[in-house]
Regions:
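Compositionally biased intrinsically disordered regions enriched in Thr/Gly
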Residues: 22-227
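Sec-dependent N-terminal signal peptides of Gram-positive bacterial secreted proteins and lipoproteins
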Residues: 2-24
């Protein structure tokens, strides 16, 4: 009898360990394409063993893509070249571990006869264990756990931008932008769990600067990218 109970307990423990491993496994991300918009690539996420988190994450992604399509439609519906407006989206998974999933969406709009195409780079960040979306407010907790203080602040981001602008390496910031009073809405995590803030075209700088990507965690001088 004792051997039977011991054997059953061992089997239960093994199943529990396998289930826990599956639950903690990185999410799977596969591309899907909108039938009406073949150039819009949509990431479809599966969190193994966690259908609730899977559903919550995919709902957020679908809402984001749907908003992009509807806002573009609304913006250009009265344009005489509306039938020559091209929309697209691609994505990159920048962080995928047991507690962080970060997906960067690169959206573009090209209108015939326009001066130039528009591009938007947005970060979608999730806790894959719960499916909850991670927003800028949550970064205080991440910073406190990692550094014991908040490094994701408008003041520190202002310092990084001001330093690069002073180096005359190509960053031209519009007058009146600095100091920042708030953080940009868009950010993502890279594979090292560094937080990158994103400034969109024309948000703080001319079009020629592109989308500005600032790594808040790196100690390297190469903390700013033009995308």
């Amino acid at each position: 009898m004792f051997k039977l109970v011991k054997s059953s307990l061992c089997a239960f423990c093994l199943l529990f360990m396998l289930a826990a491993t599956a639950f903690a496994a990185p999410a799977q991300v596969e591309p899907s394409v909108q039938q009406q918009y073949p150039d819009i690539q949509v990431p479809v996420v599966t969190v193994p063993g966690n259908p609730d988190a899977t559903a919550a994450i995919n709902i957020e992604i679908e809402k984001n893509i749907a908003a992009f399509i509807s806002q573009t439609d609304e913006c250009y519906k009265d344009n005489e070249d509306w039938n020559k407006v091209y929309m697209g989206n691609s994505y990159t998974v920048t962080c995928n571990d047991d507690s962080l999933l970060s997906i960067v969406l690169t959206k573009y709009i090209n209108v015939e006869h326009a001066a130039h195409p528009m591009r938007y780079i947005h970060g979608l960040n999730f806790n894959p264990q719960t499916g909850e979306k991670i927003v800028a407010f949550d970064l205080k907790e991440f910073s406190a756990e990692k550094y014991g203080k908040d490094i994701y602040t408008p003041e520190l981001l202002t310092n990084k931008l001001a330093k690069k602008a002073a180096e005359n390496d190509g960053l031209i910031i519009f007058d009146g932008i600095l100091p920042l009073s708030s953080l940009p809405e868009q950010f993502y995590f890279d594979a090292d769990r560094h937080v990158h803030f994103l400034f969109q075209l024309y948000e703080i700088a001319p079009y020629v600067c592109g989308v500005i990507d600032v790594d808040m965690d790196t100690e390297s001088d190469d903390y700013l990218m033009y995308r």
